[in-house]
């Protein structure tokens, strides 16, 4: 705990040039005003970040679409680098972007400052354009392909890492989604379920599915991915890889959902464009809909101790130790799992949650059940694939 917090997410704007059907962040139209991070607040955020005792500082730029406020990203990067001349931390940067606003100049800047790119890919052209709708008339998928090629030409083949969101649109075609990733020469996928925040709640009738449906699709996709590996194409399912690392090694993964106490605050924290600080990205998502239960304070009004060691922080940590939670305390999978008080709060209004009705609990148990089943087969081919994921 003395070395927390390493991941610092900064919302540089709440505006976006896309209107994704499941947008967890409830992003606003790109033409709206007063939703951008200003320099005065940004400087306070950077100063607060470097008060963290962690030897590693990762600053992740989020939105909205962060490239709509590109000047402030540059200001933060350059100021953080100046501060780090004295702080001497291992400093890393990531931009989470839909890629459409990426230019050669932006990518050259990213290359010179070692800024990584994270993006989103939900499937083929039809699925991508349905789930992730540009606010204009452009073909989002086509632009994604063009900008991915540009990104790789400057930052290298691994210059952009995609993230998948599973909705009803692609739930039953996950093997085809995997093929789409392979088509674009990616070597891994994180099969991530919808979360109960933002637009995903509004559109749950058209995008949602049961936990049982997700697990059925997940198992099918995992089998497909394993077979692809056996056939010679190295491709990781990152969620399974995280669970396997917990099961087969003595090491922690650093994945906030599989920590006890949870990674909220301890591992990662988010600073909104207006200077308010939240225990997690999901806490910020709730605040966009008016519920600021997980607000730790403001960078201009509160000290580091008030933010990170205040009552809310202590309450979140206290409620996320699986060793003390009902049912978790006696669960066979306790060693491999974690707790998510923000998710529990969103689902039923309490930090501790209710395990029998928790989709988080059901999903994690179901995934672990299947991974242990695959391990029990003692199939040399499958085991070889699993170890290749852990040692990657």
Each language-model region and where it sits:
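Canonical Radical SAM [4Fe-4S] cluster-binding loop centered on the CxxxCxxC motif
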Residues: 3-39
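Flexible mid-to-C-terminal extensions adjoining Fe-S/redox cofactors in radical SAM and related proteins
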Residues: 287-392
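Long, charge-rich, low-complexity alpha-helical segments
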Residues: 1-9, 179, 330
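Conserved, mostly hydrophobic/aromatic
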Residues: 16, 20, 61, 275
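Detector for the c-type heme attachment site
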Residues: 23-29, 157, 332-336
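Radical SAM enzyme [4Fe-4S]-AdoMet core and its adjacent flexible, acidic
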Residues: 131-142, 149, 153-265, 270, ...
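Radical SAM/AdoMet-radical enzyme domain recognition
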Residues: 42-62, 69-196, 200-210
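Cysteine-centered iron-sulfur cluster-binding motifs in ferredoxin-type domains/subunits
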Residues: 12-19, 65-68, 328-330, 334-335
């Amino acid at each position: 705990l003395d070395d927390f917090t390493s991941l610092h997410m900064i919302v540089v704007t709440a505006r976006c040039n896309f209107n994704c059907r499941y947008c967890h962040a409830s992003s606003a139209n790109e033409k709206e005003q007063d939703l951008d991070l200003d320099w005065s607040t940004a400087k306070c955020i950077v100063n607060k970040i470097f008060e963290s005792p962690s030897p590693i500082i990762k600053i992740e730029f989020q939105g909205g679409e962060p490239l709509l406020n590109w000047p402030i990203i540059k200001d933060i990067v350059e100021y953080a680098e100046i501060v780090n001349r004295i702080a001497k931390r291992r400093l890393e940067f990531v931009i989470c972007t839909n890629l459409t606003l990426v230019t050669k100049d932006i990518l050259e800047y990213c290359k010179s400052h070692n800024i990584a790119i994270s993006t989103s890919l939900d499937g083929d052209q039809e699925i991508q354009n349905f789930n992730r709708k540009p606010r204009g008339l452009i073909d989002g998928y086509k632009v994604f392909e063009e900008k991915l090629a540009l990104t790789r030409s400057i930052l290298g083949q691994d210059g952009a890492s995609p993230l998948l969101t599973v909705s009803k649109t692609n739930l039953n075609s996950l093997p085809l989604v995997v093929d789409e990733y392979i088509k674009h020469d990616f070597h891994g996928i994180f099969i991530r379920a919808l979360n109960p925040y933002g637009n995903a709640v509004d559109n749950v009738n058209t995008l949602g599915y049961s936990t049982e449906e997700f697990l059925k699709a997940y198992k099918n996709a995992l089998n497909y991915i394993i077979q692809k590996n056996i056939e010679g194409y190295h491709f990781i399912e990152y969620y399974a890889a995280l669970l396997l690392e917990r099961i087969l090694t003595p090491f922690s993964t650093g994945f906030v959902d599989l920590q006890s106490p949870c990674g909220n605050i301890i591992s990662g924290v988010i600073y909104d464009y207006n200077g308010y600080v939240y225990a997690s990205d999901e806490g910020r998502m709730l605040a966009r809909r008016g519920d600021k239960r997980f607000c730790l304070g403001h960078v201009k009004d509160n000290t580091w101790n008030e933010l990170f060691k205040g009552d809310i922080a202590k309450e979140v940590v206290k409620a996320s130790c699986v060793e003390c939670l009902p049912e978790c305390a006696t669960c066979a999978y306790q060693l491999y799992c974690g707790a998510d008080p923000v998710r529990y709060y969103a689902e039923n209004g309490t930090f501790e949650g209710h395990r029998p009705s928790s989709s988080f609990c059901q999903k994690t148990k179901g995934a672990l059940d299947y991974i242990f089943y695959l391990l029990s087969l003692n199939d040399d081919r499958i085991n070889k694939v699993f170890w290749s994921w852990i040692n990657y």
